[in-house]
Amino acid sequence: MDLSAIFLGTGGSVPSARRSTASVMLVRGGRRMMFDCGEGTQRQLQRSVGLAQVDEIFLTHFHADHILGLPGMLKTYDLTAREEPLTIYGPRGLHDLFKTLGRLIGRTDFALDLVELDPGDAVPHDGARVEAFAVEHGMRANGYALIEEERPGRFDPEAAKRLGVAEGPAFAALQRGEEVEGSDGPVRPEDVMGESRQGRTVALTGDTAPCHSTVSAAADADLLIHDASFSEEEVQRAADTGHSTVGQAAAVAREAHVKMLALVHISSRYHVGTVLDEARDVFEPCVAPRDFDVIEIPFPERGEPTLVPNGAREGSNGPSGTLSEPVKEPEAAE
């Protein structure tokens, strides 16, 4: 099952010509999970993978640069006759937020469900879960970790044959975890299956100061997407505003033993090369994605996460499994 992180907005609190405000979309198989929806996010989608029918949205917190894209995108979905229900998750206060946003959006013809998550709460998916964890931003705020379950080990057909298991339905039954009969008695799945294989983990912090809860949630993760708002010269400002410096984000990644660190929420006043130099002095496997970059996350036995520059840009083939039928344009009003 393919897993990709599509970076729609990688900038700081103020959008710039090159970096939009916060939004990342994880695509796992055919499921699209959006994390934060800053101003202009639907335009970023239209310029990249298309205004795909996002399956669910996770908000880390309710500062404007993380939520201002919601009213426009939800209204567009309504105007284009979306039928599928949409669930939006966020910290406590989500219902209060939508008392205000609802006045802008109005009633939608598709079902819109709001679910508040506390740290430790999890949303189940097919073979995975999205788990909320606490971050430190001076207000109620969640990070999120997509955590896959372990996968069954590889089936060894030759071992099954040696135990007298006939090819066909019995092979399939063993791979489903069922016991079958062999030439000398029962054959259990563990007799012919290798060790369980590790799933993947992607952790996203949203805005946060460095904290132990992120280290715990991102332990041994394949990818950590972390706030990197300030250079080391502004460490006190980072502390005062509940953000992280580049070096602090790198230190969290090093302590968590992640495979790759992606730095986001980068201010336009910094040169990306300088940002990366600061981070790599602390943690080498580090990238600073730009808008429309993609990180492909393979299963652990198949390699390391890979940054694909402009991988989601309009006109490119895009990451595997992300493209969909375009949303129909609404008819012009009379």
Each language-model region and where it sits:
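Metal-dependent catalytic neighborhoods of phosphoester/phosphodiester hydrolases
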Residues: 69-77, 101, 271-280
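Cap/insert and terminal regions of metallo-dependent hydrolase folds
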Residues: 174-296, 323
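Active-site metal-binding motif and surrounding structural segment of the metallo-beta-lactamase
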Residues: 39-89, 111-118
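Short, surface-exposed amphipathic charged segments that create phosphate/polyanion-binding patches used
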Residues: 125-133, 299-310
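Long, low-complexity, intrinsically disordered segments
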Residues: 317-334
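Active-site-proximal loop/helix segment associated with metal-binding centers of metalloenzymes
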Residues: 15-17, 126-216, 223-225
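Divalent metal-coordination and catalytic microenvironments
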Residues: 5, 36, 45, 61, ...
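Conserved beta-strand hairpin/beta-sheet module of binuclear metal-dependent hydrolase folds
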Residues: 1-50, 83-85, 144-146, 153, ...
